[in-house]
Amino acid sequence: MLAPRRKTRQLMVGKVGVGSDHPISVQSMTTTKTHDINGTLQQIAQLTATGCDIVRVACPKTVDAEALPIIAKKSPIPVIADIHFQPKYIFAAIDAGCAAVRVNPGNIKEFDGRVKEVAKAAGDAGIPIRIGVNGGSLDKRILDKYHGKATPEALVESAMWEAGLFEEHGFGDIAISVKHSDPVLMVEAYRQLAEQSDYPLHLGVTEAGPKFMGTIKSSVAFGALLSQGIGDTIRVSLSADPVEEIKVGDQILQSLNLRPRKLEIVSCPSCGRAQVDVYSLAEEVTEALDGMEVPLRVAVMGCVVNGPGEARDADLGVASGNGKGQIFVKGEVIKTVPESQIVETLIEEAMRIAEEMDPEVLAAASASGMKAEVKVTK
C-alpha cells in the first residue's frame, strides 16, 4: 500500500493546482528555441495532446523573453519560464503572463539581493515561484561548506535558504525541486526536504540520460518517493522527444494507481513454450488499440500456460498456439480464431466491451488523458 500523500501548502500554476489537495501533475520542457514562437507552440500542442499538464520553456536570451507574452497567451496549458544566470528575465517572464517562474539560485547573478524584488513582482502578479536547486549548479558557498560535493544535505540547505529569503519578504507561494543525476542521492534529498517543509515538491532526476536509461532512473526514484507520499508534480527528463517524457510520467503514475488507468496491454516475456512471436504480436495489438481511452486491460500471451489462467484479471486477451488464438474475456474463452485474425478480433472485442462500459467510468478515464503502453509481466 502507498503511504498517505504528504500534506503541503497549495499553489495554482495557471489553472493547474499543485499540492496535496490536487492530483499529481506531469510536466515537460520544450526543446525548441523559445523565440521560434510557431515551433514552440506546435511542440506545446503535441505535449498537450499527449497529456502534459504544465510546460516549461527556456529563456536564455532577450529574443526568448520577447516571445513569452505570445506563448503564454496562446499555450493551451500553463507555461513556466525557466530562468538561469540573468535575473532580468525573471521580471520579463512575470510581465509576460507566465503561470510561474523557475529560478536556479545557484547560477543567477546576485540572486539573494534580488529576492525582495522578485517576491514583490511575483506576489503582485499572483504567480508561484519554483526554487529549482540542481546538483550540477549549486551555489559556491554551499559547495564550499560541503567540500565540493552536492550531497543531499547541501541540496536541501540551498533550497531552504532561498525559500527562507522569500518568506522573509512575505512570499510563500513556493514549490521546490532538489534534483540530482544520481537517483539515490536525489531520493534522499527529497526525503529530507519533505521532513523539513510543507512546500509542494517537483520531482525530477536531472541529466537522467537517453530514453531507456532515463526511464529506469526516473521510475526508480519516483516510485520510491511517490510510494511514500512525497511528490506533487513530476518531470521525467529524457534525452528524447519531450512527448516521451509525458508517456513515461503518465505510466509511472498509472502504475502506482495515482492516476486512473486507461488502456493497458499486458504481455508475457515469452519463452521456449511460446508458439507465436509474442514481441511482434504485443506491439501490433498496442499500435492497433493506441489512443483507445478506456480502462481496459488486454493480455497478449504466447501459450496456454500464461493465458487465460495467469491473465485472468485481464478484461480481454489472447492465448496463442498451433497457428491459432484463443480469445478470452474475464478468463473465459469465447472463441478461437486463426493467428492472422487475432489483432482484428481483439479490436472488435475491445470496442464491444468499451460500448458496454458505464458512462461514468468512461468519463473518469477520459479525464486522465492516458494512452496505451505495453507492460511486460512475468
Curated annotation (Swiss-Prot):
This is 4-hydroxy-3-methylbut-2-en-1-yl diphosphate synthase (flavodoxin). GO terms for molecular function: 4 iron, 4 sulfur cluster binding; 4-hydroxy-3-methylbut-2-en-1-yl diphosphate synthase activity (ferredoxin); 4-hydroxy-3-methylbut-2-enyl-diphosphate synthase activity (flavodoxin); iron ion binding. Converts 2C-methyl-D-erythritol 2,4-cyclodiphosphate (ME-2,4cPP) into 1-hydroxy-2-methyl-2-(E)-butenyl 4-diphosphate. The gene is ispG. It comes from the Bacteria. Pfam families: GcpE. It comes from Corynebacterium glutamicum (strain ATCC 13032 / DSM 20300 / JCM 1318 / BCRC 11384 / CCUG 27702 / LMG 3730 / NBRC 12168 / NCIMB 10025 / NRRL B-2784 / 534). Its EC number is 1.17.7.3. Transmembrane segments: none annotated. Its cofactor is [4Fe-4S] cluster. It is an enzyme of class 1 (oxidoreductase). Binds 1 [4Fe-4S] cluster. Belongs to the IspG family. One of its GO terms (biological process) is isopentenyl diphosphate biosynthetic process, methylerythritol 4-phosphate pathway.
